Amino acid sequence: MMMNAFIEPAQHHLASYGLRMSPNTTASNSNAQQQQQQQLEMTQQQQQQQQQQQQQQQQDQESAAATAAAYQNSGYGHFNSYASRDFLLGRREAEYGVAGSAGQASAAADSMLFSGFPAQAAELGSGFGQHPFHSHHHHHQMRMGMADAYAAGHPYNHHGNFPTAAVHHPVVHHPSHHAMSAMHPAGAGAFLRYMRHQPASSASSVKQEMQCLWIDPDQPGLVPPGGRKTCNKVFHSMHEIVTHLTVEHVGGPECTTHACFWVGCSRNGRPFKAKYKLVNHIRVHTGEKPFACPHPGCGKVFARSENLKIHKRTHTGEKPFKCEHEGCDRRFANSSDRKKHSHVHTSDKPYNCRINGCDKSYTHPSSLRKHMKVHGNVDEKSPSHGYDSEGEESSSSSIITGGAQTPPSTRLDGSAGSSSGVSSLSGGSGIKSSPHSIKSEPNPMHSVHLGASSSGSSSTASSSASHLLQHQQHQHQQQQQQQQHQQQAQQQQQLTAHPSDPKSSPALQLMAASASAYLPPPLGPPPSHHHHPHHHQAAPSPGAAAASASMLHHNHHLLYHPAAQHHPPSDWYHTTAPSGSAEAMNPLNHFGHHHHHHHLMHPGAATAY
């Protein structure tokens, strides 16, 4: 430090010497050298960092080019544009300092380029799996649309690193899923159309073999149809078999018989009038369709040139066939449509409904098809309603008329000589019917248990009495009915045996009438084909057989043959009108019968009424 001589000596005791003190330059020089060294070191570090960045960029370029070249050789050359994009992404990530080291900075580009495919360059293995934010366990959540939850901490949000996933799980769970998600992180569907195409080599490797089944017509009558000699030559293309048929079997101008001898042909050897018609017919057996539609994007093919000509009019809009009726300007693309339309102007209705009982007819087949839907909506099927035209046989699958029921074609009418009250007016409606008159065909089940006739249409008193006697023979083998039913049945037997007994009181007669109305007479065991566990009581006296013959037969149907078996739910059961006698059936007797003997019948029988 230099002292000034003019300073007051009281304050500075060295001023009397007149000396000027200079600062120490050694310390300042050392500080300057240290600063220079630090600057040099910083400069060197910056240069090293720049060199490392340049080297990293070169490595990124080389790795991207190598990966793109590898996938170009494996058939995915249309993804070359990803190389430049991934290089820029890797450079951007290095600039932001996302990677922790120079080796980690190269992982961004590597994880983007189809890591799910097996074709990988050997020098790329070191860079896989080093992405700082990679997490294999989040891979499937990313693919399921949960990437938003991880986008905040992840700059690029690509988790398709397949080799790192292999570190966690050596066995690949879904290799195709990894591949598709790696190709397009936003969604694999954009590239699905490229994956579905089969290679041309596999399509060409499948050989189409066709066999000629033409029968040798030299001696067709001497050999049985199953033993005729066939050609059986095998061809590998449509052109080969068509050429073979044309040359070997159809023949040239010298052949005058134009008949098809293909195995199973429906023409049965009937010849054609011209050779070209036979050639067109053979295409039915070979499946050849040489006439393709030239319209772009149509792709339809046809076996006949006429059909192609008609089809072309759908593209051009041409309608050369004008309606021949005066005053009608309708035009059509083909003559068949014009013919269908021509019936509109005439009274002809050639398209008839073939359902039995339906007399509808229409001028156009489309109207008939709409009408047939009415019949098709009916779920019930009856064997008595079938087709009655064109020689077609009726089948059990034919449908009945929808909406209203058809009139009954056959009724189970009683004979004229049956017992009293069998045939009478039904409920005062004026319609003559028997107790078994239904709106359906007779069921074969009636003939099983009647034993007198196959259709069950004659139920006389003698036949009912024979049934009763037959039931009496089995009465000793049965157990007695419950006591309550037995007492009621005994009362009914007494009143039935002596209906005009003057000793009977009016109250007892009223009770007997009600009992006879609601309880059937005791019956014998059912036939062997029924499995109802009934128990019947003792039989009535033989004198009551003739009086209750018709009622016995009626109740026999109700007991052993539930109405659900032979009476459709929509059919009404016609009963006889009530008479003055106590033994006559009440029109409501089947309701009471179901009430008292519901345990003897099928659960679904009561719903038939």
Curated annotation (Swiss-Prot):
Zinc finger (C2H2-type): 210-249, 258-285, 291-315, 321-345, 351-375
Principal subcellular localisation of the protein: nucleus
Domain of life per record: Eukaryota
InterPro entries reported in the protein's UniProt record: GLI-like, Znf-C2H2_ZIC1-5/GLI1-3-like, Znf_C2H2_sf, Znf_C2H2_type, Znf_ZIC
Sorted UniProt keywords: Activator, Developmental protein, DNA-binding, Metal-binding, Nucleus, Pair-rule protein, Repeat, Transcription, Transcription regulation, Zinc, Zinc-finger
Compartments it resides in: Nucleus
Region ranges (Disordered): 20-41, 373-550, 583-609
Extent of Polar residues compositional bias: 22-32, 399-409
GO BP terms: central nervous system development; eye-antennal disc morphogenesis; germ cell migration; midgut development; negative regulation of transcription by RNA polymerase II; periodic partitioning by pair rule gene; positive regulation of transcription by RNA polymerase II
SMART domains per record: ZnF_C2H2
Gene Ontology CC entries for this record: nucleus
Gene Ontology terms for molecular function: DNA-binding transcription activator activity, RNA polymerase II-specific; DNA-binding transcription factor activity; DNA-binding transcription factor activity, RNA polymerase II-specific; RNA polymerase II cis-regulatory region sequence-specific DNA binding; RNA polymerase II transcription regulatory region sequence-specific DNA binding; zinc ion binding
Biased composition annotated in UniProt, kind: Basic residues: 528-537, 591-601
Tissue occurrence: Expressed throughout all segment primordia; expressed ubiquitously in the ectoderm and mesoderm precursors.
UniProt cross-references to Pfam families, sorted A to Z: zf-C2H2, zf-C2H2_15, zf_ZIC
Coiled-coil boundaries: none
UniProt feature, compositional bias: Low complexity: 414-434, 449-498, 538-550
Family to which the UniProt record says this protein belongs: Belongs to the GLI C2H2-type zinc-finger protein family.
Functional description taken from the UniProt entry: Transcription factor essential for parasegmental subdivision of the embryo. It is involved in the activation of wingless (wg) in odd parasegments. It is also required for the timely activation of wg in the remaining parasegments and for the timely activation of engrailed (en) in all parasegments.
Record-given protein name: Pair-rule protein odd-paired
Lineage: Eukaryota, Metazoa, Ecdysozoa, Arthropoda, Hexapoda
